[in-house]
Amino acid sequence: MAAAANSGSSLPLFDCPTWAGKPPPGLHLDVVKGDKLIEKLIIDEKKYYLFGRNPDLCDFTIDHQSCSRVHAALVYHKHLKRVFLIDLNSTHGTFLGHIRLEPHKPQQIPIDSTVSFGASTRAYTLREKPQTLPSAVKGDEKMGGEDDELKGLLGLPEEETELDNLTEFNTAHNKRISTLTIEEGNLDIQRPKRKRKNSRVTFSEDDEIINPEDVDPSVGRFRNMVQTAVVPVKKKRVEGPGSLGLEESGSRRMQNFAFSGGLYGGLPPTHSEAGSQPHGIHGTALIGGLPMPYPNLAPDVDLTPVVPSAVNMNPAPNPAVYNPEAVNEPKKKKYAKEAWPGKKPTPSLLI
């Protein structure tokens, strides 16, 4: 085991001893500044870990001016099952509690002991993996309260300090897993190169008309507000050689309509009327496209005298059956029957 000096142009190196081995899972360091826990450093992956200011050579960087580039090494002894701390000839020294370690001499670090590097105020406490309680309660032991009983059943520690310690450990463990996953993924995945967008400016020779109503007078200014609706029209009847148009068939029907002759319906028209307007058959004339009847100026007179019918001034009385009960009864009013179209005749209820 040897360590190069931190001074000079040569790079500091650390030779791993033969007795170094992999530590048990869950071994970690609590980084505390004052009374506040800053983070947890998991140290169960490698045989040794380097501490110092140089982030390229050290596993854990100490950001303090009093620390050397490669300050110290933390090594796990595979036979003794203990952790040893080695000072790599640092300028301001490595401390176990308040005792400064000798350079290049391994010093055993007990569990729950605290170490510090240089003049840094951060203290590093060695911890094992937090122990969880069994899920079942042994014997007749009873928990004090409902919360403590629930924590015991879930396998969580009863005290708040132990619970916070377990939470911080799990957080640090998850961060390490996510970091390792990202680093391994970056080795296999090649990031595609970004294509630069064409930043050149081009001009189009074609003129683009935005408002056509300003150029074309046939385009209305409010064309966007106009709505067009198409209403289908019934097809007109096709006029064939054997069929008549609507207007002609209508006039034919009006001509064939039987008009009453009136007082002078049978006389022919005079010469002035015949020359001024056309007339049709049956004593009708076409006025405004419609047939109108002519008045009969000389109707036929019936010369046979009309004999009036004889009127009987003394009608014979109609015999009726005498009913003595009807005489004593009071007279009843008789109302007229109501009649309307479609009413069926019903027998009268009045006597």
UniProtKB/Swiss-Prot annotation:
GO molecular function, one term: ribonuclease E activity
GO cellular component, one term: nucleus
Natural source organism: Homo sapiens
Disordered: annotated span: 316-351
Post-translational modification: May be inactivated by phosphorylation on Ser-199 or Ser-204. Phosphorylated by Lyn in vitro on Tyr-264, and also on Tyr-335 in the presence of RNA.
Keyword DNA-binding listed: yes
Mutation effect (residue 199 to A/D): No change in subcellular location, no effect on interaction with EED or repressor activity
Keyword Repressor: yes
Recorded consequence of changing residue 204 to A/D: No change in subcellular location, no effect on interaction with EED or repressor activity
InterPro entries: Cell_Proc_Reg/RNA_Proc (IPR050923), FHA_dom (IPR000253), SMAD_FHA_dom_sf (IPR008984)
Cofactor note text: Endoribonuclease function is magnesium-dependent.
GO biological process: cell population proliferation; mRNA processing; RNA catabolic process; RNA splicing
Protein localization: Nucleus; Nucleus speckle
Region spans: Involved in PP-1 binding: 200-203
Protein name: Nuclear inhibitor of protein phosphatase 1
Impact upon substituting residue 264 to D: Abolishes in vitro phosphorylation of isoform gamma by Lyn
